[in-house]
Amino acid sequence: MSYIPFPNISPELFSIELFGVTFALRWYALAYIAGLLIGWRLVLRMIRAERLWSFGPPMTEDQLERLLTWVILGVILGGRMGFVLFYQPAHYLAHPLDILKVWEGGMSFHGGFLGVMTALVAFCLKERISILPVADLLAAATPPGLFLGRIANFINAELWGRPTTLPWGVAFPGEAAQSCPGIEGICARHPSQIYEAGLEGILLFAVLSLLVWRRGWLHWPGSVSGVFLAGYGATRFLVEFVRQPDAQFVSAGNPLGLAWQISGYGLTMGQILSLPMILLGLYLILRSRRTA
C-alpha cells in the first residue's frame, strides 16, 4: 500500500528558557496570531474601500481596533468552552481546573464562532452600530485564519482523518493514529486537515472575495455572513465523513463515532453543530436578497 510519510516538523517553531522556565512558540499559536492580524488588515481594507458601501462603512478604523480585542476574547473563551461543553463535558465536570489547561489543546471552531458572535453583538450594541454589516466584514476576513489553523492542525499531527488506502493517505505518528482495527502494519489516514484548509480556507475565501470585490454583496447586509455560514457548514459537514471522530464518541458498538444515530445511520458531533450554521446561512442569504 502506498502512502505519504508524515513530514518531520516540530509543533514548536522555537523555544527559549528563562530562569529555568521553557517558553515555546507553537505553530498553532502562530496561526491564531497571524489569522487575527491578516483578518484585521482585510477588514481595514474593506472599510477604506468606499465603493463597497451604499451609505459608508458600518464602523470607523478606531472602532475596528477596539473590536479586535473583543474578537480575540471571543475566539479564545468561546473556542475553549465550546470544546468543554460539546466534546468532553463529563471530564471537565469531574476536573474543572483542567478547563484552564489550554496548552494541552482542546479548542472548538463552533464554540469559537459562538464566542465571536456574542462578542460582536455586545460590541455593536455598546457602540450603537449595525450588527449585520460588521458581521459581513468579519465573515469575509475569516477564511485565511481557518486555513492557517488547519495547517497548524496538520503540523501538530492532530484531527486526522479515517483510515484510507488512497495514495495520498498520510501515516501520522503516534499510537492513536496508528491504531486502526483490521489494518496490519502502517495505517495511512485521510489528511482531513488539508481537505479543510483547501475548502474552508482557500475555496471559501475565493468565493467571498469574489462576492465582496466583484459583485458588491456588502451592499446587502447579511448576505456575505450567510454565504460564510452556509459555506463553512457545508464543507465541514462533508469532510466529517472522512474525519476521525473524537475518541470519546468511538466505541465497539459505535465505531464511526456518531454522536446521534438511528437504525445504523447518524451524524457526528461536527455535523450536528454544522447543520444550524447551514440553515442560518441560507436564511441570511434569502433575507438579504428579499430586503435588497
UniProtKB/Swiss-Prot annotation:
MF GO annotations: phosphatidylglycerol-prolipoprotein diacylglyceryl transferase activity
UniProt keyword terms in alphabetical order: Cell inner membrane, Cell membrane, Membrane, Transferase, Transmembrane, Transmembrane helix
Recorded superkingdom: Bacteria
One example of a Gene Ontology biological process annotation: lipoprotein biosynthetic process
Bilayer-spanning residue ranges: 18-38, 67-87, 105-125, 193-213, 222-242, 266-286
Membrane topology: Multi-pass membrane protein
Pathways per UniProt: Protein modification; lipoprotein biosynthesis (diacylglyceryl transfer)
Compartments, as annotated in UniProt: Cell inner membrane
Cited PROSITE patterns: LGT
InterPro entries: Lgt
Similarity section: Belongs to the Lgt family.
Protein name in UniProt: Phosphatidylglycerol--prolipoprotein diacylglyceryl transferase
Natural source organism: Cereibacter sphaeroides (strain KD131 / KCTC 12085)
Lineage of origin: Bacteria, Pseudomonadati, Pseudomonadota, Alphaproteobacteria, Rhodobacterales
